[in-house]
Amino acid sequence: MASSHFGPASPASSTPPPSSAYARLIAPTITRNSSSSSSRSTTTCSSTSSVQAVPMRPPPIETSTAATSRSQLPSNRHSENEAEHDTSYTSPGLSVGGRGGLARNGPRSNRLGTSPQARHVPPSIVALSPSPSPILNMASKRQSNTETVSGTSPSTPLGKSFLAQQDLSPNSSTIPLRVTISVDPNDRLSHDRESHSAERPRSSGNSPVRGRHGHLSTPSSPTNSYRALGGKPRTLSVDAGQNWGGSHRSRARDGDDRERRQSQVSSASSGALKKHSLDDWVLGEELGVGSYSTVYCVTPSANTHSPTSPQPARKYALKVINQAHLIQEKKVKYAMVERDALIRLSDPRPSKGHKRGVSSSSSSGYAQTGSAGKRRSTASIGGQSSMASVSGGTVSNSKKDTRDRLSIVTTSSAASSPVLTASSGSTQLSPTAVSGGGGNIKGRRPSRSAEPPTPVQEQTEMLIRGGEDGKDGQDGQETPSREWDRDRDWDNMTRSRPPSPVREESAEGGEKEKDEEERSGAEPVELGAAIHLTLPPPQIPSTPEPRGSPLLSTDGHRTSRETPRDRPHLTPKRRRQSLAPSERSVKSASTTGKMSAAAHPGVVRLYSTFNDSSSLYFVLSLASNGELASIIRKHGSLDITSARYYAAQLIDTLEFVHSRGVIHRDLKPENILLDEDMRIKITDFGSAKIIAKDEPIVDDSSRSRSFVGSADFVSPEVLRNEVATTASDIWAFGCVLYQFICGKPPFRGATDYLTFQKILKREVEFPKGIDEDAKSLIDTILDLEPNLRPSITFIKTHPFFQSIDFSTLWTIPAPPISSGLREPSKSTTLAQLEASDIWGVFEGSDVGEEDEDGFEYDADTVSPRPEGGAVGEGMMEPLFDRRAAASAVHNVDHPKFSRLRNQYINLGEDLDPPRPAYAGAGTGGRGKREKEVEKKKGEKARGLSHGSESSGGNRSALAGWLEAIKFGGAGGGGMSGSATSVAASDTVRTPGTGTGTGPGSRPGSRAGIPSFGLGPGSGSRSNRGSGASMRSDEARDLSMSLGGLRMNMSKASEFDKWTPLLLANESIIFTSPITLRTSSPALQLHLPAFLLPAPKKRQLVLTDFPRLLMIKDDNEADGDPAGSDSGAGLSSSSHVESGGGGVGGGGRGGGHGSLRIKGEAVFVPRPSTATGSSTTKGGGYSAVPNAVMDVQEKGSKGFTVQTPGMVYYCHVDSVELRAKWMAAIHRVGL
């Protein structure tokens, strides 16, 4: 091959006499021709027989890039004949910062430097070969402007170029640099051995150096100029050849580097979606806040949404999960379980999901060389025999398919919508569009850059079973050889991946592919508004390949023609892939009328997951109408038509979820969302259990199981620590259906503990007017035995769903929602309901307050953490804890067992409330009334109620605890004694002179709190023994009887008005009317006063329990309930309602139905040194939701009472009354 050499020229040849016709151009006068694309200009003269060149100035080193060859760099060696010929030039001086008058990327400076610079001699180009050098022939090639020297930059600015100041090595001399320019890109450029050789070997066909043969190759990266030519340069690129500067590189390493570069753009060139990040989404409004996550409405950013799309950007829900909170609260598994469950519900096949972004050879952007074969795109239509041809709007193949196959019918949404086209063999589908009548297909071509592919509009896909011999693949006929399996075929066919426009051939070239085409063929596919695509089932190799061109197989496995053994040097490393399906893999079934096995409209869909250093992100489908629970609260309850519609959608979704091996285990209205069409979507699979479809459920009672779910909807087998099955979701479905119709859960109690007892006893009551079919279905579902609960098939065929057509359930419009059996509160607005009850449980505007069957404690109770912040086993389980369930099960199974140990109860261990010291002390006989009640009922009483129905249907958490744990149920302990007269006092009532001295007598005081009698004429009053057991209705009769005795006193006091609301043996210490406001502790420091709820008139009562009661009197809501601001309430003219003490009294509560307990705060007793008891782990204030934590003065006439769940702002009428209250509270315990 011809080559040219730089070298020292002889005086005769290097200094020819100047010609008058062609003036000699020296280096400082060389300028660029604006019409040339080259940065060098040369002029030749032939005064002798040899071809010689005028000295040429190389480009300055500051403008060298990674594409600049070493041969083009200047040298610091000077010519010996520099003094003879004045051909030297200088470069501008260095400016501040080392930029020698020539910016890094800016235009060149035309000014000469002022400082003296070293003089350099440009090398001479001498052609020693008969074949001219490409550089010498550039002048003739500029006319056509069709070829340019590789490495030149069209953006290089015009003007003079200068050399910058260079580092001078000690070994530098004035001898010009000897440079060899080779035409062969495979030349080794060895200056020591081959510089004087005029012959060069021919370049091989598989030269790794890019560039066309016969032209200069792409220049390499610059090397250090001060190094000797024989030294080892620092080459930053692999494109300089196999051996550069003595550094030998192997062909295998060269191929690895090339493969590494190809894998960087493989994802973009194959159409695979890149990994999402937060920058890909535009955050909108906040949809909701959970315990460890926040949900936002997001839309794709501009770079991921096609601006030419006729539809607006689709909205999604982005769930942001705090990783630090997950780790701290030990809830990492909930996020992982939710992700895995949603993936299974979207793509439930046992095989691996689609591998996004895999760096396979089928998606590489560069052509393979050598044995890898050539790549051909499925979008190409040029004369390849193996490619499908396009003619007259038909894509056809020369071979016929004689096998069973599946067809895809794709209907475009518009005339300009892209459609799918098919290629021969088993290649991937490539989205293209048909334009014009010439058959030219325009669409996405194989990309060679890292730019994201053009988005393709969603298509509506419908799968049809083709004929056996390949005819009429779209008619939907079944073949006689294979029975149509809906789940299997839909499951297999909807598996998809982003289409790859590049197809890979085998290592043997195109022969293997040709054999594949001969073995399988494809029917013609017509292009139009609706096209039919034919995919023959590919051959499944014995060893599935994790890399290469995945194929769509009929059994859900991906196949490939090659194995890693065929291409060992091209197989990249495995990468972590997302199992979430692509958007085009699952289509909406609402337009086709058929349900896809890969998705269900009743389940929220997971689109992608990603994370950063602080959070996890789940991209979910958007449910714009919020939770179904808020709709129930808004309307009070659902009408029977809406309840039937949403219950049918719920049970249909449960059938799908269970068929995919997922048990939700936390089904409730809060986890049921409504989309824009008012159809349900089940969400929050963090508590789900994932099992195989055919996996038998093994009951391993010795295994420690986690309690998950919500207290109102948990099944009895879960409470008993048994294995959770699909029957647990059926139980929850029955509870949800009950709440749809009745407006509240069937087993809700004041605490989780009471709720568990109701569930275990199956204490459910149906309101009047409930639909009989609904009542029958709920009663059948709520069976304590899981095996006796009905199946989903039975539920669907129940008469309650007789009017429901499940085949069109998800396509018919949703019925309008109206109120059912329970009307919404008149004073409650939607804005207040959507605030998540931030104003508290006891507000006058609570849901159901005006209703007769209203339940005050509608807020879920969260189990508190123990003192000290310690996290024990089971403490981080959601909404209810292990100990409450175990205690409830134990008390139901052993009703006669008493857990009372002493006067102080360990709240964290035994879940018992605080109680006075006298409650468990002493034994004695019971009163006459109690004995008559026992004799009438024939059994012992089991509990004590404070009269929830007699007090207006209200319950408190404390009274519920007392009823459940058999308060006073250990050891007899009656109390008798004659009370003395009541002396008037400003602040605290003085104790009377007690005459009862029996073993059951009540002590005179406890912890400094005096005891009081009931007034003159009260006679003796006995207390039920601690070992006694009495039912709630008997306790209410006793309470009303005692209330009647109080009302018949000769001198009634104001205290007697509130005694029906008190517990047995509980006395009032201090009371007065107040104006009450409530707020959440989390909001008290952030909300201004005008945003707080309106103040309410209440009666504040302090008892010797000790506790504070906020009582509402409906009859005196507009007036002064107490009529006195003295605080003691000892007015002789006290208001007494007709009917007396409640025996035979009219209205709710036996004449006291107007009184309601709206709030309660308990002073937790501390352990005393006299008894030697101590508070163990889990006790203290944090273990009681309504325990008084602090009491502070606020303003001149107010004070605040703070509990873990509520802050009470109490305002009295005078400063003196506030002082009395503070003194009474401090005497009690603070």
From Swiss-Prot:
The active site is at residue 666. Signal peptide: none annotated. Residues 34-50, 977-992, 1002-1030, 1120-1137 have a biased composition (Low complexity). Residues 281-801 form the Protein kinase domain. One of its GO terms (biological process) is positive regulation of cell integrity MAPK cascade. One of its GO terms (molecular function) is ATP binding. PROSITE patterns: PROTEIN_KINASE_ATP (PS00107), PROTEIN_KINASE_DOM (PS50011), PROTEIN_KINASE_ST (PS00108). This is Serine/threonine-protein kinase PDK1. The gene is PDK1.
